[in-house]
Amino acid sequence: DLADLDALLGPRTRWVAMTHASNVLGTLNDVRAVADRVHAAGARLAVDGVAYAPHRLPDVAASGADVYVFSFYKVFGPHYAVMAVERELLLSLPGLNHFFIAQDDMPYKLQPGNVNFELSYGAAGIPDYLDAAAAHHGLSGSVREQRQAAVGLFAAQEDALSQHLLDYLRGKRGVRVIGRDCV
């Protein structure tokens, strides 16, 4: 509830961290609404998208998040992660590397070791997979629209399966489903 957030924000608030979606219930949180409130309070917002990205295509810019993270292995890729950070914030972060690596020497200042090239290359297959799914289903529009629509097809299938499960559970004697009455 956003009113609960408003009660927690104050002049000493510097950061708010949240999930984009519940890993347990799949509840989707309105990141943009939270970002607007957090920024109005003079704080920054970090969003964990690990439970959202496998089911919807994140739009980090539209979300208003200052930091957005998720794991590629959750979206058909290797065991690797991505962290999207607005540039000015990224430049202000202290480096993890040697002292002689400049603060603006990106991405090296945040790489305490060598990049795993195999994993990096493996992540390049994710857009190919989404493009193949879009082509298979004859989806049209811009590349982003096609990928969004492909992920939307995945989500629709998941929702149908989840609804089937919820309907089954609600019909079982001795089972009580607690939470929102939707998928």
Which residues does each PLM region occupy?
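Pyridoxal 5′-phosphate
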Residues: 1-183
